């Protein structure tokens, strides 16, 4: 079993145990989640209130019980995640992938930054020199970035990986 973080619980919603959910909308497709420190909980109800998602979990029946979960991390089992359409990726699947420029490995994805308008790959370089091992930021949606099976390929960008 492999768990991946999909969000956190925000403030309680109303009086019957609802919790605001801050995170990936993939939660809309799940029947259960793993709650940090509390184990697996079935999702009994899930709905939108404006732009927010509200989750009701099994065993969380009032506001007091919901308050105990505020701020906790929420996880899903990778096998429970729905498949994505072509060209879309779960972030966790990109972390650790090698990055190549013209067939030469220049680094590895160590994190992904949500920069608002687009997501940015944080790539830690590989090489002998300290400069080679520096972290570089590359927009994931840029036309010069291609995600392929098991690797990421970046067209040459003058000065970035020289």
UniProtKB/Swiss-Prot annotation:
- Which GO molecular-function terms appear in the entry? ribosome binding
This protein's GO CC annotations: cytoplasm; ribosome
Subcellular locations according to the entry: Cytoplasm
Q: One biological process GO term for this chain? A: rRNA processing
Q: Which Pfam families match?
A: PRC, RimM
The UniProt record lists the PRC barrel domain at: 86-160
What InterPro entries does UniProt report for this protein, alphabetically?
PRC-brl_dom, PRC_barrel-like_sf, RimM, RimM_N, RimM_N_sf, Transl_B-barrel_sf
Keywords, A to Z, come to: Chaperone, Cytoplasm, Ribosome biogenesis, rRNA processing
Major location category of this protein: cytoplasm
User: What does the function comment of this entry state?
Assistant: An accessory protein needed during the final step in the assembly of 30S ribosomal subunit, possibly for assembly of the head region. Essential for efficient processing of 16S rRNA. May be needed both before and after RbfA during the maturation of 16S rRNA. It has affinity for free ribosomal 30S subunits but not for 70S ribosomes.
The record ties this protein, via PANTHER family, to:
RIBOSOME MATURATION FACTOR RIMM
Q: Which HAMAP family match?
A: Ribosome_mat_RimM
Cross-referenced NCBIfam families, in alphabetical order? 16S_RimM, PRK13829.1
This protein's assembly is summarised as: Binds ribosomal protein uS19.
**What's in the domain note?**
The isolated N-terminus (residues 1-80) forms a closed, 6-stranded beta barrel; it probably has the same form in full-length protein. The PRC barrel domain binds ribosomal protein uS19.
What family is it from? Belongs to the RimM family.
This chain's protein is named Ribosome maturation factor RimM
Record the organism.
Thermus thermophilus (strain ATCC 27634 / DSM 579 / HB8)
């Amino acid at each position: 079993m492999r768990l991946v973080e999909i969000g956190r619980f925000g403030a309680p919603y109303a009086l019957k145990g609802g919790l605001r959910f801050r995170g990936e909308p993939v939660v809309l497709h799940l029947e259960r989640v793993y709650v940090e420190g509390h184990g697996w909980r079935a999702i009994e109800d899930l709905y939108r209130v404006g732009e927010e998602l509200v989750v009701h979990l099994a065993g969380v029946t009032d506001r007091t019980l919901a308050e105990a979960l505020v701020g906790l991390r929420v996880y899903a089992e990778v096998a429970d995640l729905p498949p994505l359409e072509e060209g879309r990726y779960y972030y966790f699947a990109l972390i650790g992938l090698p990055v190549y420029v013209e067939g030469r490995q220049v680094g590895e994805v160590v994190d992904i930054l949500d920069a608002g308008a687009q997501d940015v790959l944080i790539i830690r370089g590989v090489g002998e020199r300290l400069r080679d091992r520096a972290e570089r930021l590359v927009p994931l949606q840029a036309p010069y970035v291609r995600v392929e099976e098991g690797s990421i390929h970046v067209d040459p960008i003058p000065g970035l990986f020289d």
